[in-house]
C-alpha cells in the first residue's frame, strides 16, 4: 500500500466520521488498517493526510496500529488490560478518545526517520501525545486536538 491517508467517504452510522485507508501493522506491515478501525472525524482525517505527506517528504513511513473503537471493542480492550492479557492501558467504554474517532496509535519504533521527528510532524498538524517520553508506555498514542490551549 502507498504511504498515504486516503479519505474514502462518510460513515453513515457515525456523525461527522469518515472512513479512511491507511497503512497498518496487521498481516504484512503496510496492509490497510482493518475497516472496522479505519475511521476518524473529518478534521482529524484531513490532518492525518497532511501528516502522511510530511512524513513521506522527510523520507519516512508511518504505520497505524489502532484508530476507531466501538464501545464494545473499547470495553473488551479494557477487560484485556484489567486481566493482564494486554499491558497497554485501556480505559473502560465511554472513556476513550478512540471511541470518539479522534485517536490513533502508531508504530513508534518503525518510522524510518525516528519517533521524535514523527512526533514533531504529528504535533504540527494537531496530533498530541499524552506522555513526554518517546519510548515509555503510551508513547504510540496520539489524540487529535483542533485547538491549542
Positions of PLM-derived features:
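N-terminal secretory targeting signals
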Residues: 1-9
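Sec-exported extracytoplasmic/periplasmic mature domains
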Residues: 53-57, 79-83, 123, 127
Amino acid at each position: 500500500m502507498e504511504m498515504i491517508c486516503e479519505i474514502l467517504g462518510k460513515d453513515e452510522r457515525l456523525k461527522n466520521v469518515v472512513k479512511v485507508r491507511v497503512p497498518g501493522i496487521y498481516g504484512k506491515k503496510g496492509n490497510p488498517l482493518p475497516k472496522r478501525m479505519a475511521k476518524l472525524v473529518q478534521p482529524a482525517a484531513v490532518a492525518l493526510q497532511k501528516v502522511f505527506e510530511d512524513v513521506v517528504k522527510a523520507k519516512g513511513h508511518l504505520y497505524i496500529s489502532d484508530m476507531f473503537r466501538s464501545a464494545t471493542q473499547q470495553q473488551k480492550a479494557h477487560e484485556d488490560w484489567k486481566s493482564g492479557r494486554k499491558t497497554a492501558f485501556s480505559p473502560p467504554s465511554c472513556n476513550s478518545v478512540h471511541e470518539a474517532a479522534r485517536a490513533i496509535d502508531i508504530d513508534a519504533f518503525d518510522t524510518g526517520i525516528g519517533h521524535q521527528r514523527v512526533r514533531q510532524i504529528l504535533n504540527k498538524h494537531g496530533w498530541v501525545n499524552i506522555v513526554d517520553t518517546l519510548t515509555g508506555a503510551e508513547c504510540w498514542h496520539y489524540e487529535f486536538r483542533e485547538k491549542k490551549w
